[in-house]
Swiss-Prot record:
ATP binds at K258. Catalyzes the attachment of glutamate to tRNA(Glu) in a two-step reaction: glutamate is first activated by ATP to form Glu-AMP and then transferred to the acceptor end of tRNA(Glu). A motif ('HIGH' region) lies at residues 11-21. This is Glutamate--tRNA ligase. Keywords: Aminoacyl-tRNA synthetase, ATP-binding, Cytoplasm, Ligase, Nucleotide-binding, Protein biosynthesis. It comes from Lactococcus lactis subsp. lactis (strain IL1403) (Streptococcus lactis). The gene is gltX. Coiled coil: none annotated.
Length: 483
């Protein structure tokens, strides 16, 4: 690539960072870093009605948490928010008006709605009908004067050549073309409040910031021909476009929707649950891109080195919550204990469980956790009531050899002094019980695990027994023997 690579992530501060937007940011970041280019953050805040307080801060904070950095942003550069760039937009709107490539439109929202209703009733796709069509200059002047007298504020529309073909070679999808007649007619580039519309402002911004590539979701494909209209009108070279496929829910096969409250979709949600940022970064990087091979766990450095925009998938990317949980568990299992302990601390504190056993409990459950917040539920045994047994667990306790195995193991535990109730001293008791009773394998370990912890699965049993403490374990074993 001869041209300096400059890409941007340009969120609207209208809410939290969605997983889909995070993917857009991440792919642009990987693309820029792989090619030694610039990654730019720009805030598109022209939609004042949907503006959310702290929306910008939330976007940047969560991108930073994911491990991304950037070369230019509103934090370091002036006029990187669209609301600060209004004079620049006005300059080019005035240029288009002067050149006759744009014009003031006085049709009211009610009139436009009525036009669209008639078109729909006739089976025609809604499109703008030029209000000046067929008017003489005098008629046009009289019409404008009448509208001004009624205090109707105009919008500015750009003229669309309906005979033109707008085409581009998409990085992901290959050659795409749109007929001008399908754009929907002359469209608004400046609203009544003086703010530019998205499709106009984004072109001015991308040109002004020398953006070389625009990589975004394929819900923007319909915006691209509109933006090409502006590039042509202003005589500018368009960047190269790439449109990533949709993200779908792996269980339903439907587009991932913010209205789907059963699926966590915001980066903030994963932060609050104690997921590791490295795992989320890794997971998102594989949503619609794959370097090939069977490997699924990559460091940020590996992803930057391997990233190839030509391997972006043409098929929808499946968001699989189970896969994400598996990945986070892998990261937690292999992370430094100090990092995992720090991650679990807020949850232990909130549950009033940050006591002298906290470190040992986190060590015990580190291999099991799919997210740090699970430490509370996992440690319920140590702080709450004995769990309700499953039918399968009850069947195991009802086995013919269970009473002998439990009573023998219980007697040996009881002989251990309180100060010697450690993993090193507990572990040999299993072998001693096996030798004395002849009960071995699953028929020995499983009833003891169920009786001591209430579960058929869990962390290392000797460690669990040691942390529960002698008094509690003996009480649990007695309860099982007396049933």
């Amino acid at each position: 690539m001869n041209k300096k690579i400059r890409v941007r992530y340009a969120p609207s501060p209208t809410g939290l960072l969605h997983i889909g937007n995070a993917r857009t940011a991440l792919f642009n970041y990987l693309f820029a870093r792989h090619h030694g280019g610039d990654f730019i953050i720009r805030i598109e805040d022209t939609d004042r009605e949907r503006h959310v307080e702290d929306g910008e801060r939330s976007q940047l904070e969560n991108l930073r948490w994911l491990g991304m950095d950037w070369d230019e942003s509103p934090e370091t550069h002036e006029n990187y928010r669209q609301s600060e760039r209004l004079p620049l937009y006005q300059k080019y709107i005035d240029q288009l008006l002067t050149e006759g490539k744009a014009y003031y439109s006085y049709k009211t929202p009610e009139e436009l709605e009525a036009d669209h209703a008639k078109q729909e009733a006739a089976g025609i796709a809604p499109h703008y009908i030029n209000e000046y069509a067929g008017m003489s200059d005098d008629e046009k002047a009289a019409y404008i004067a009448e509208r001004k007298a009624q205090n109707i504020e105009p919008v500015v529309r750009i003229s669309v050549d309906e005979k033109a073909i707008y085409k581009w070679n998409d990085i992901v999808k290959g050659d795409i073309e749109f007929e001008g007649k399908n754009i929907g007619g002359d469209w608004v580039i400046q609203k009544r409040d003086g703010y530019p519309t998205y499709n106009f402002a984004v072109v001015v911004d991308d040109h002004d910031m020398q953006i070389s590539h625009v990589i975004r979701g394929d819900d923007h494909i319909a915006n691209t021909p509109k933006q090409l209209v502006v590039y042509d009108a202003l005589g500018w070279e368009a960047p190269q476009f790439g449109h990533m496929t949709l993200i779908i829910n792996s269980e339903t096969g439907k587009k991932l929707s913010k209205r789907d409250t059963n699926t966590l979709q915001f980066i903030e949600d994963y932060r609050k649950k104690g997921y590791m940022s490295d795992a989320i970064f890794n997971f998102i990087a594989l949503l619609g891109w794959n370097p090939g091979g069977e490997k699924e766990i990559f460091s940020r450095e590996e992803l930057i080195e391997l990233f190839d925009e030509h391997r972006l998938s043409k098929s929808p990317a499946a968001f699989d919550q189970k896969k994400l949980d598996w990945l986070d568990n892998e990261y937690i299992k292999n992370a430094d204990f100090a990092k995992v302990f720090e991650l679990t601390k807020p949850f232990l504190v909130a549950a009033n469980r940050f006591d002298e056993r906290a470190e040992e409990l986190v060590k015990l459950y580190q291999p099991q956790m799919k997210s740090a917040d699970e430490i509370v539920e996992l440690t319920d045994l140590f702080y709450g009531d004995f769990p309700e047994l499953t039918d399968e667990a009850r069947e195991m306790l009802a086995a013919e050899t269970t009473p002998l195995a439990l009573s023998t193991f219980r007697a040996k535990l009881a002989e251990l002094p309180e100060n010697d109730f450690t993993v090193e001293n507990i572990f040999p008791l299993f072998k001693a019980t096996q030798k004395e009773t002849g009960v071995k394998g699953k028929m020995l370990w499983m009833p003891i695990r169920i009786a001591a912890s209430g579960s058929m699965h869990g962390p290392e049993l000797p460690e669990t027994i040691a942390l529960l403490g002698k008094e509690k374990v003996l009480a649990h074993l007695d309860a099982a023997l007396n049933k």
